From Swiss-Prot:
Cellular component GO terms, alphabetical: plasma membrane; proton-transporting two-sector ATPase complex, catalytic domain
Protein name per UniProt: A-type ATP synthase subunit B
Protein's GO biological process: proton motive force-driven plasma membrane ATP synthesis
Known function: Component of the A-type ATP synthase that produces ATP from ADP in the presence of a proton gradient across the membrane. The B chain is a regulatory subunit.
Subcellular location: Cell membrane
Assembly and binders: Has multiple subunits with at least A(3), B(3), C, D, E, F, H, I and proteolipid K(x).
Species of the source: Methanothermobacter thermautotrophicus (strain ATCC 29096 / DSM 1053 / JCM 10044 / NBRC 100330 / Delta H) (Methanobacterium thermoautotrophicum)
Top-level taxon of origin: Archaea
Keyword Cell membrane: yes
One MF annotation (Gene Ontology) recorded for this entry: ATP binding
Length: 463
């Protein structure tokens, strides 16, 4: 065995398989320890210890295992976990999935080196999420409100415009009447070059890049890198939020690619698979990402998460959206039917939900009538959708005058409330006023979910 005790350098690689390599005869190696690898050609790569069994270590190589062999590859265990150097200079910069600048700018001079796995928030130190975050999108602001410190995922499908929606939220999101700075951290995992170019062009064209920090893992980058990309982003978010009192919105896309990377690594390790081949610990792994959102008592800053995931075959019961739903505080669901009608953003408000909405709306936060308007819009749109199904069976002639008004409401709701331009930034006032305009299409006797004193104040044409 050829071992340098001081540097813990080994040349005892016994197997190379996929993204993994097995090193024998190791001593004092720890789980998640960072490894430096020197290829036979002298190229330097990095990896991480996945598993330790007696004198054997399983290492995942971030840059892939091509050109590595079992004879001359050198392995050095650093004794440290994966870290990222953080600084406020990261604002407006673009990094790859491992935290290296890829925008042609200078290297970041770090103010701190932080472990990318973070440290869990003490539940007793958490402050309940509150304070409205305005995204400029009516279906979110008006009916599925995002609040500061919440984790609210977007469930999409293949071919739906979740990338456009993510870019729009990154551009427009803001906390109203707050002096603290607002920042966006955008982490992309497994996206194509075309998608990456779209995001970069959009951020640069609109000037949003000034307040956005981007971490980009592309589809042809190693799958292993996808596991650390969101952790790099969240560690940076924690630094901005809890060291510099900033309100940080973290957008993670696409968590489905992240989970596929988890499955790939699990298969390479020959672990016993869980549901649909995903590892049994996927729930715990996702929770280690989602639970890094929140607010801490005594700290001004906050981390709000909007993870985006593409549901395979639009199946909301698939393990990825299913497990995500257990951990997060609601969901925004994109609809293929609305997309076929040419509606953008195709948010289906009926299965969508923000569980923490009540803490972020109302007088002093948005407007006194917000809750009632939202409930009434939900109720009326749900009835209009039911009547569409009924009309398909019995015909329009069988509907009453009241039924026709609800049908018209559902159509107008989709055309005017859900639909908006890709660069349209609606204020919460505009969203609520539009809601009242649509409610004016219904008989006043049907407005049972809004407070009576709000009707003459906000309903157009009311006395």
């Amino acid at each position: 065995m050829n071992v340098n005790i001081k540097t813990r350098e080994y040349t005892t690689v016994t197997e190379v398989s996929g993204p993994l390599m097995i090193v024998e005869g190791v001593e004092g190696v720890a789980y998640s320890e960072i490894v430096e690898i020197e290829t036979p050609t002298g190229e330097k790569r990095r990896g991480q210890v996945l598993e330790v069994r007696e004198d054997l270590a399983v290492v995942q190589v971030f840059e892939g295992t091509s050109d590595l062999n079992t004879e001359t590859t050198k392995i050095r265990f650093t004794g440290e976990t994966a870290k990222i150097g953080v600084s406020l200079d990261m604002m407006g910069r673009i990094f790859d999935g491992t935290g290296k600048p890829i925008d042609g700018g200078p290297e970041i001079i770090p103010e701190k080196e932080l472990d990318i796995n973070g440290s869990p928030m003490n539940p007793a130190a958490r402050e309940f999420p509150a304070e409205f975050i305005q995204t400029g999108i009516s279906t979110i602001d008006g009916m599925n409100t995002l609040v500061r410190g919440q984790k609210l995922p977007i469930f999409s499908g293949s071919g739906l415009p979740h990338n456009e929606l993510a870019a729009q939220i990154a551009r427009q999101a803001k906390v109203l009447a707050e002096e603290s700075e607002f920042a966006v951290i955008f982490a992309a995992m497994g996206i194509t070059h075309e998608e990456a170019n779209y995001f970069m062009r959009d951020f640069e064209r609109t000037g949003a890049l000034e307040r956005v920090t981007v971490f980009m893992n592309l589809a042809d980058d190693p799958a292993i890198e996808r596991i650390i990309t969101p952790r790099m982003a969240l560690t940076t978010a924690e630094y901005f939020a809890f060291e510099h009192d900033m309100h940080v919105l973290v957008i993670l896309t696409d968590l489905t690619n992240y989970c596929e990377a988890l499955r790939e690594i699990s298969a390479a390790r020959e672990e016993v698979p869980g549901r649909r081949g995903y590892p049994g610990y996927m729930y715990t792994d996702l929770a280690s990402l989602y639970e890094r959102a929140g607010r801490i008592v005594g700290k001004e800053g906050s981390i709000t998460q909007m993870p985006i995931l593409v549901m395979p075959q639009d199946d909301i019961t698939h393990p990825i959206p299913d497990l995500t739903g257990y951990i997060t505080e609601g969901q925004i669901v994109l609809s293929r039917d609305l997309h076929r009608k040419g509606i953008y953003p195709p948010v289906d408000v009926l299965p969508s939900l923000s569980r923490l909405m009540s803490g972020g709306i109302g007088e002093g936060r948005t407007r006194e009538d917000h809750s009632g308007v939202s409930d009434q819009l939900y109720s009326a749109y749900a009835e209009g959708r039911d009547l569409r199904d009924l009309m398909a069976v019995v015909g329009e002639e069988a509907l009453t005058e009241r039924d026709r008004k609800f049908l018209k409401f559902a159509d107008e709701f989709e055309k005017r409330f859900i639909t908006q331009a890709r660069d349209e930034d609606r204020s919460i006032e505009e969203t609520l006023n539009l809601g009242w305009e649509l409610l004016s299409l219904l008989p006043r006797s049907e407005l049972k979910r809004v407070r009576e004193e709000h009707i003459p104040k906000y309903l157009p044409g009311a006395e």
